């Protein structure tokens, strides 16, 4: 099922499968989100929960049992309950039912996704509550994909990623399987812009740590049109696109937790996490994205 809201600038559609934003159009009717061509990448803007990246061996252990887990958790692959779709707000909820706890993740949780339109900005808040009787440890992140180019008159090299100040981000290195290898390097030094090319992501994504910038955006160089994500408070920000020539979309991904590492312990309670909630506690994070195009 899908729900749609709109204001004077934007029209947003969210699917209850994965609580995923699947369409965002401006007043000209132009589609701003990637439309999930399965020949390139079959998603639009998935929620990453309760882990980000891959699990070493594709498994984790909890409560004496081994659980299999795919990339970026499972919230993106299951049905969420629509709570509200009116005015400028869409709200959905996912809770750990018996099937989830038996097959995917043996901990109680309630994940609430709230989308709110505010002028040309979409605020997407993810709230996690622990309704159980034991600690809840989880990872979480965002993965929106934006159409590139903005129109037929432009090509890949007409675009660049920009920070709001010069940056020398620490790039966390990964093995070809996507798991972190414990090393890092500097890809760019004291740069405020990263030129977009068709080969930029030939070796997959860039996981950036240590950013001081409050924003990461994709800009059309000759017009100034842009899409900007507020990444303030996020320890990790990734940029990525699927292999395609020319580039069809770009992702700007603020994460509150690290991707999995090759030497991560199998015990879930020893894994790095975005947060560890005691019973009754609640935690939230918001991604605000502004569309000036």
Describe the residue ranges of each PLM region.
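Extended, loop-rich substrate-binding clefts of extracytoplasmic carbohydrate-active enzymes
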Residues: 70-119
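Active-site pocket scaffolds in enzymes
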Residues: 226-293
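Acidic, contiguous internal or C-terminal segments within carbohydrate-active enzymes
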Residues: 101-151
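Beta-strand elements of well-folded, non-transmembrane domains
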Residues: 18, 96-98, 115-119, 130-132, ...
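Acidic-aromatic substrate-binding/catalytic surfaces of carbohydrate-active enzymes
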Residues: 11-66
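Short, Gly/Pro- and small/polar-rich lid/capping loops
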Residues: 1-8
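Active-site/ligand-binding surface loops and adjacent short beta/alpha elements
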Residues: 148, 152-232
């Amino acid at each position: 099922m899908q729900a749609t809201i709109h204001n004077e600038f934007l029209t947003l559609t969210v699917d209850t499968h994965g609580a995923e934003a699947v369409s965002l159009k401006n007043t000209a009717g132009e589609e701003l989100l990637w439309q999930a061509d399965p020949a390139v990448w079959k998603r639009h803007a998935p929620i990453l929960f309760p882990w980000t990246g891959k699990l070493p061996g594709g498994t984790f252990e909890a409560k004496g049992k081994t659980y299999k887990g795919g990339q970026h958790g499972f919230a993106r692959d299951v049905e969420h309950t629509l709570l509200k779709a009116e005015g400028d707000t869409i709200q959905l909820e996912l809770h750990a039912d018996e099937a989830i706890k038996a097959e995917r993740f043996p901990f109680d949780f309630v994940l609430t996704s709230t989308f709110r339109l505010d002028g040309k900005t979409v605020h997407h808040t993810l709230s996690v509550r622990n309704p159980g009787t034991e600690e809840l440890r989880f990872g979480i992140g965002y993965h929106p994909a934006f159409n590139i180019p903005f129109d037929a008159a432009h090509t890949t090299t007409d675009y660049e990623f920009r920070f709001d100040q010069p940056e020398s981000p620490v790039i966390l290195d990964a093995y070809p399987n996507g798991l972190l290898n414990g090393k890092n390097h500097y890809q760019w030094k004291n740069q405020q812009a990263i030129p977009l090319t068709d080969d930029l992501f030939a070796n997959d994504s860039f996981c950036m740590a240590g950013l001081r910038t409050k924003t990461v955006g994709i800009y059309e160089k000759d017009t100034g049109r842009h899409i900007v994500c507020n990444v303030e408070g996020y320890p990790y920000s990734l940029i990525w696109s699927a292999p395609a020539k020319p580039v069809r979309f770009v992702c700007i991904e603020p994460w509150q937790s690290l991707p999995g590492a090759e030497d991560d312990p199998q015990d879930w309670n020893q894994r790095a996490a975005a947060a560890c909630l005691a019973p009754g506690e609640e935690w939230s994070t918001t991604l605000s994205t502004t569309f000036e195009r």
